[in-house]
Amino acid sequence: MGQLNVLTGSKGEIR
């Protein structure tokens, strides 16, 4: 994705 995935919650991984 290349953007912050808010669905990850506290993780905030860039996918």
From Swiss-Prot:
Enzyme Commission number, as recorded: 1.11.1.7
Superkingdom assignment: Eukaryota
Any single Gene Ontology cellular-component annotation: extracellular region
Keywords assigned by UniProt, alphabetized: Calcium, Cell wall, Heme, Hydrogen peroxide, Iron, Metal-binding, Oxidoreductase, Peroxidase, Secreted
Catalytic reaction annotation: 2 a phenolic donor + H2O2 = 2 a phenolic radical donor + 2 H2O
Keyword Cytoplasm set for record: no
Sample GO molecular function, one term: lactoperoxidase activity
Subcellular localization, as worded in the UniProt entry: Secreted; Secreted, Cell wall
Cofactor remark from the record: Binds 2 calcium ions per subunit.
Cofactor: Ca(2+); heme b
GO terms (BP aspect): hydrogen peroxide catabolic process
Function: Removal of H(2)O(2), oxidation of toxic reductants, biosynthesis and degradation of lignin, suberization, auxin catabolism, response to environmental stresses such as wounding, pathogen attack and oxidative stress. These functions might be dependent on each isozyme/isoform in each plant tissue.
Family: Belongs to the peroxidase family. Classical plant (class III) peroxidase subfamily.
Name recorded for this polypeptide: Peroxidase 3
Organism: Cycas revoluta
